[in-house]
Swiss-Prot record:
Species assigned in the record: Mycobacterium tuberculosis (strain ATCC 25618 / H37Rv)
Binding site for NAD(+): 283, 289, 334-336, 343, 458
Complex and partners: Homotetramer.
Tagged with keyword Thylakoid: no
Gene Ontology, cellular component aspect: peptidoglycan-based cell wall; plasma membrane
CC cofactor: K(+)
Entry annotated with the keyword Transport: no
GO biological process, one term: IMP catabolic process
Name by which UniProt lists this protein: Inosine-5'-monophosphate dehydrogenase
Effect of deleting the gene: Cells lacking this gene display impaired growth.
Thermoactivity: Optimum temperature is 37 degrees Celsius.
Pathway: Purine metabolism; XMP biosynthesis via de novo pathway; XMP from IMP: step 1/1
Chain residues that bind K(+): 336, 338, 341, 511-513
Length: 529
């Protein structure tokens, strides 16, 4: 065996330690193994890994301001958004969420026309003045009027002629005792002249006309007698009942809707815009993709002056930065944290949600782009943690799926009530409902599957306990958030975003939950997992 002048064996015979460079200089070992210190990017933390540290406070929870930015231009009084899932958000949920101070995002697992129709239902559900009221003609039948009233959930219609002039009004009172549904509207309606208001009437003047004349509907006409709007007493009542309601400049409820990137995505988006949607959510499982970035950019350039555009979902700083560069008005964060999502075990991909939010915020905050935390939220405290990590709003799925307003099927099991809840990557969602076509496959870039048995699901189907009306659930969730703001001395969400965390151990998590006792009475905001 040959030796060099140093007395060491030839270098070809050396077994080199992974912690020693060839030049003889030692290097620190890589804690996770291997020789690349960047192979494991960082420690990933989620909601159960941290707690918010209490701080000096003069904040009373009841006085805390929970308003926060959903997008660059839209601010919600309650920082909660319902998820675009077919067992969570359709028009009924979207209406209830907006009335509670949040907003609903309509799912896209239905035909384009139906989704656009749901947008119209939300926008028509209440308004300071309906600027394009549903109308009928004198020669329409009572059956046709009844169908229109049922579709839009209204109790009467103005009657106009071919020139748009108001000639009468027909309400439930006119039709209630009519047996012959083939009768024409002209035979039954209350004919002009009617109590009307002129264009530009103030809210107080309109309310005065309604009160003095003891009527529920006040048509608004121009100088030529043509119908230009409709004011109803119900809208004044709803304003009093829901003071936190999220509304546009015309007094209509705000609503969002999900779109994809393949197939009919562009046609769908344009129909939704025409229907009056306020926010378009380009909703995919992986938004750090050229198709998604191009869709966000195209929507911003084509209709960005009419709607806000949200991009998602992402879990890294670079992905969030890419959406910001594409022009997104908000970035939605969450790859695999949802209770019904299996992406992290099927694909092995994702990032724990607290870390994902922190990373996305690092890219979005300098650009003034809000972050939406989507998924993994099980308790009201998780919402507070998500916002403290830098998110501006939280998107909820399982927490709302059990409410009366959710479209999931009501199920009875051993005398207890549940509602169905499934991931949009589940086989059921990608196969459609009741044999109907599925429009959610492209969310997981699976729209090219040749047959349904070739689908690779990234979600499951399940059930959640029935929770009653949405208003009660939102009250508990916002109550928990307000409590967190009190503990941390945060009068606003923006201050809460500066709160500090403490990392906890599994023993700390066990200590955080009720322990060493048998629960005898369930609390409305806590349940054992």
């Amino acid at each position: 065996m040959s030796r060099g002048m140093s007395g060491l064996e030839d270098s070809s015979d050396l077994v080199v330690s992974p912690y020693v460079r060839m030049g003889g200089l030692t290097t620190d070992p890589v804690p996770t193994g291997g020789d690349d210190p960047h192979k494991v990017a960082m420690l990933g933390l989620t909601f159960d890994d941290v707690l918010l540290l209490p701080a000096a406070s003069d904040v009373v929870p009841a006085t805390a301001d929970t308003s926060s930015q959903l997008t660059k231009k839209i601010r919600l009084k309650v920082p909660l958004v319902s998820s675009a899932m077919d067992t969570v958000t359709e028009s009924r949920m979207a209406i209830a969420m907006a009335r509670a101070g949040g907003m609903g995002v309509l799912h896209r697992n239905l035909p384009v026309a139906e989704q656009a129709g749901q947008v119209e239902m939300v926008k028509r559900s209440e308004a300071g003045m309906v600027t394009d009221p549903v109308t009928c003609r004198p020669d329409n039948t009572l059956a046709q009027v009844d169908a229109l009233c049922a579709r839009f959930r209204i109790s009467g219609l103005p009657v106009v002629d071919d020139d748009g002039a108001l000639v009468g009004i027909i309400t439930n009172r006119d039709m209630r005792f009519e047996v012959d549904q083939s009768k024409q509207v002209a035979e039954v309606m209350t004919k002009a002249p009617l109590i009307t208001a002129q264009e530009g009437v103030s809210a107080s003047a309109a309310l005065g006309l309604l009160r003095r004349n003891k009527i529920e509907k006040l048509p608004v006409v121009d100088g030529r007698g043509r119908l230009t709007g409709l004011i109803t007493v119900k809208d004044f009542v709803k304003t009093e009942q829901h003071p936190l309601a999220t509304k546009d400049s015309d007094g209509r409820l705000l609503v969002g809707a999900a779109v994809g990137v393949g197939g009919d995505a562009w046609v769908r988006a344009m129909m939704l815009v025409d229907a009056g949607v306020d926010v378009l959510v380009v909703d995919t499982a992986h938004a750090h993709n050229r198709l998604v970035l191009d869709m966000v950019g195209k929507l911003k350039s084509e209709v960005g002056d009419r709607v806000e555009v949200v991009g998602g979902n992402v879990a890294t700083r670079s992905a969030a930065a890419a959406l910001v560069d594409a022009g997104a008005d908000a970035v939605k964060v969450g790859v695999g944290p949802g209770s019904i999502c299996t992406t992290r075990v099927v694909a092995g991909v994702g990032a724990p949600q607290i870390t994902a939010i922190l990373e996305a915020v690092a890219a979005c905050r300098p650009a003034g782009v809000p972050v939406i935390a989507d998924g993994g939220l099980q308790y009201s405290g998780d919402i507070a943690k998500a916002l403290a990590a830098g998110a501006s709003t939280a998107m909820l799925g399982s927490l709302l799926a059990g409410t009366a307003e959710a479209p999931g099927e009501l199920i009875f099991v051993n005398g207890k009530q549940y509602k169905s809840y499934r991931g949009m990557g589940s086989l059921g969602a990608m196969r459609g409902r009741g044999g109907a076509t599925s429009y959610s496959k492209d969310r997981y870039f699976a729209d090219d599957a040749l047959s349904e048995d070739k689908l690779v699901p990234e979600g499951i189907e399940g059930r959640v306990p029935f929770r009653g009306p949405l208003s009660s659930v939102i009250h508990q969730l916002t109550g928990g958030l307000r409590a967190a703001m009190g503990y941390t001395g945060s009068p606003t969400i923006e201050v809460l975003q500066q709160a500090q965390f403490v990392r906890i151990t599994p023993a700390g998590l066990k200590e955080s939950h009720p322990h060493d006792v048998a629960m005898t009475v369930e609390a409305p905001n806590y349940y054992a997992r």
